[in-house]
Amino acid sequence: MDLMDRPHLAWHLSGGTTELLLVEPDGRNVQCTRIGGTTDISAGQLIDRTGVLLGLPFPCGKHLDQLSQNAIEKDFFQVKCPAMEFSLSGVQNKVEQYRANHSPQETAAYALRCISYAIRQATTNALKEYPGLEVVFSGGVASNSMIRHDMRMLNAIFSKPEFSTDNAMGIAVLANRLREG
């Protein structure tokens, strides 16, 4: 919990949002400033849309993650991320095109590699502007094994996957800090 007492970066990766935040202590609370993320659809939306395209059960995150484990190809679309923001709607079109000539396993991995690349680029750019800060990953998409693997070199902090599925843990931590404070 001492992380809450020093500045850090935080990703909220879910079906509803993909935001990169600068988190700064403010007494027992924190101030969060959005500094990056998607400008359109969220990572979770792209994951679910890819899963539906592949006939997976909804919500698709866990199933897409499992399906991608057997992929061999390393193809991905390099999302443009000149600063800390990026668009994923074009990736959805690329995934649909990719699916026409590739297996479900390869398509699942392709979509996840595109998402992971964009997040990694935005994080790398943020660390240039805010050097030395740790990066916390939360939200359901943060339980994805490819994203967890790809972010390991970026001062990344992940909770256990079972605590990454919703925001209940974060709300509980903040409520406890305010109660104590």
Predicted regions and their residues:
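A contiguous, well-structured pocket-lining segment that forms one wall/lid of small-molecule binding clefts
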Residues: 66-135, 141-158, 176-180
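A short helix-loop
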Residues: 6, 11-14, 18-105, 181
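Glycine-rich phosphate-binding/hydrolytic loop that grips phosphoryl groups
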Residues: 159-181
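Active-site nucleophile and cofactor-binding loops and adjacent substrate-binding regions
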Residues: 11-13, 40-41, 136-139, 159-167
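Short, glycine/charged-enriched secondary-structure capping and boundary segments
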Residues: 4, 24-28, 150-153, 173
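Hydrophobic side chains within alpha-helical segments
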Residues: 48, 125, 169-170
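Conserved phosphate-binding catalytic cores of ATP/NTP-utilizing and phosphoryl-transfer enzymes
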Residues: 1-9, 173-177
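Hydrophobic (often cysteine-bearing) scaffold residues that line and stabilize catalytic clefts
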Residues: 43, 147, 168
